[in-house]
Amino acid sequence: MKWNLHLLFPALLGVTLVATTAEEPWFRRSLVGLEVGPTGSQFGGSTNDTVFAKRFNGRDIARATEASRGEYLVIWTREGDWAFYDSKLLPKPPGLGQRDVLREAVDEGRKLGLPIIAYCQVQYPSQTLREHPEWRAVDQDGKPIAGRVCYRSGYLDYMKTMVEEQLAYGIAGFHLDMVDQGFGPPYGCWCATCQKEFHAQYSQPMPKGVTWDDDWDRMLEFRYAGSERFEKGLTKHIRRINPRATVDYNYHGNPPFSWEVGQRPVQHAGNGDFVTGETGVWGFSALTVGLNAEFYKAATPGLPFQIAMQRGVRMYHDQTTRPLNDLRWELFTLLSHGGFVTLVDKTAFDGGLDPQAYERFGSAFKEVHTKRAHFQHTPVYEVGLYYSSRTRDWFGRDKPADYFQSFQGAHKAMVYEHIPWGVVLDENVSLDTLQKFPVVMLPNVAIVSEKEVALFRQYVDAGGKLIVTGISGTRGPRGEPHSQSALNELMGAKFMGELDSTDNWVRLRTPPKAEMETLFQNIPHARHRNESAGRIESVPFLVRGPAVVYEPTTATPVGELLKPHRSTLHSENRYNKDWPMSADATVGPAILLNHIGKGSVLTFAASPDWATASDHHLTETRKLLANAVRLLSPTQRLVIEAPTTVQTVVTHEPATRTLRVHLLGYNAPPQTTPAKDRPYVLPVPIEDAPMYRVRITTREPLKSVKALNRSTQLNRRGNLVDAVVNDIHEVLLLRY
């Protein structure tokens, strides 16, 4: 069927749109809003469910959003089976009767001055695929993939007609969700259209499956291009109809997502006005809330970015409400990193709202408005964590966690040690980007191209400091092992081989130069006192993860890398690989320090990053990473001492010569044994505000120090600030 894409244009001409003023776009002036949609039919709706969405009322939701001090409303207009407005393409749920939820919301939003954004689900269009089975994605065996649509099919024209319908209401913009290609096998798409277009582009047939060779490299590019073309095509169509209508796509280019979703970190983040991503302890961990925000920022530098968080205790699709302090912790973590935040409310099955939830939203949003002058300032970074999409795809392959663990472990170490950090992405990296960070860390970046090596060389020559861990640079462009590391010259060492173990050990003996003592700080194993012998000894400690044997050329070696013992059980493959064995013999140096130009490269032969995110996380492994940063960058602008349960974000406002230190106290109570998958548990939601001490030492002389909370106790002595904080979120303002 050919869709008439201009069917609704005449209707649009007479519509007064919400976003027609010359004022700043809604997303540039907003910090908090709500997304509201019904829940209960995610896996298939039925006309027998006449109660579903019966009370889902756009007018009531707009009023509730405005009363809770939300600055915009994202209202559900389309899910897999239903439309919640009068659509010619999809039926409405029977419970709505003659009501039009989108019309209700837009009319009320216009009265309230509340921008209304249409939430429109893209992937998993169940009803549409029942009507158009020819649009289904197909697996390598020619079988349709249940629920999935092919983005190269006629579905794009269908979606263009759908957005025309919704634009006619006068909405401020679209949030287009689920623009993925699936979150696991079976993979697509091998439909006739895809096969034809692939052959036209590459003059050869598609690979028969996931082959991890040259053909699969082309297939990955083809998949990425298909998603990009779909998004750009839809955005262009929307802007042609109404240039003021905003467009954002829900994004899955960040960990734990990989190639299977059809998105790269940068390629698929910038196809709208801003990127939207998600957080949530249930799906991403507490620690990754801030990481996701920085990832979205790095993917779209200079643009606003939106993060969605959920109301529910467990996940999106429950109707529970988290304690206020739990909501506050996630909300202010995201705002501190510079994003704007959409809180997702999934209504009751009948579409009704929970007044207790909106009372909590109102309390949290009121606090945001009180503090809004303290968000979205220039970040202060010390370390850039380098993320390689090529390593994700071709080293991680079907187990991307093998790569993610190092990246996330490096992040964990920086957070726990209160070292300001940001994210650097391989797709948009430049010398200017690198030079925003005094130190750049390559956490097991297995695949490093010649172009990247040249860029790192420029960065180091000019005074940059590079930290390299584990197997960085030891793989070819398709993940194949190399006989040498691409980083040999930078590291000042020759790659001799990779250990076939992950239970590797490090011993830190007396450093060859006194200035290297920094590497040993707060690592008791490096300075164990043997009372009976009357001497200080260095004791090996486990550094779980990949390890490489190096032979120094121009680098100074520090410490020892030790391989683990192996027994007969190992040779017979009867030993549990998750259980580490003790240290055996030394096989090479643990650390290499090489000076190039005005800068330096510090290499860990082992993987303290991987270890920090592992089940065998020792304090020593993260201290190694932190000490490396402090050795390479001894004159940090701020040194922050705080409990590991406190996250810190530092920003700068040059016009007022003010540094802001956001303090975020995570205070989840202990959890009990789970009913399944012991010992892996979700943390308990935060109920109580924590109390903790913080000490900050600044490089610049301070003129004044102020805390936002009256309860915070402050004491300043020159450039040293001590604070006692008793809240989830605090901001210390340091004027210099």
Give short role names for the model-derived ranges:
Residues 47-68, 88-114, 157-158, 229-230, ...:
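Aromatic- and glycine-enriched glycan-recognition loops and surfaces
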Residues 66-101, 124-146, 150, 183-194, ...:
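Aromatic-lined carbohydrate-binding/catalytic grooves of carbohydrate-active enzymes
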Residues 24, 28-30, 105, 116, ...:
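Carbohydrate-binding surfaces of carbohydrate-active enzymes
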Residues 49-66, 153-165, 258-267, 323-331, ...:
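Short, acidic/polar
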Residues 55-81, 169, 274, 331, ...:
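Catalytic domains of carbohydrate-active enzymes, especially glycoside hydrolases
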Residues 26-35, 70-77, 98-142, 175-178, ...:
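Glycine-rich, aromatic-flanked loop segments that form ligand/cofactor-binding clefts
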Residues 23-54:
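Boundary/entry segment of secreted carbohydrate-active catalytic domains
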Residues 53, 118-169, 178, 194, ...:
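Active-site-adjacent "subsite" loops/lids of carbohydrate-active enzymes
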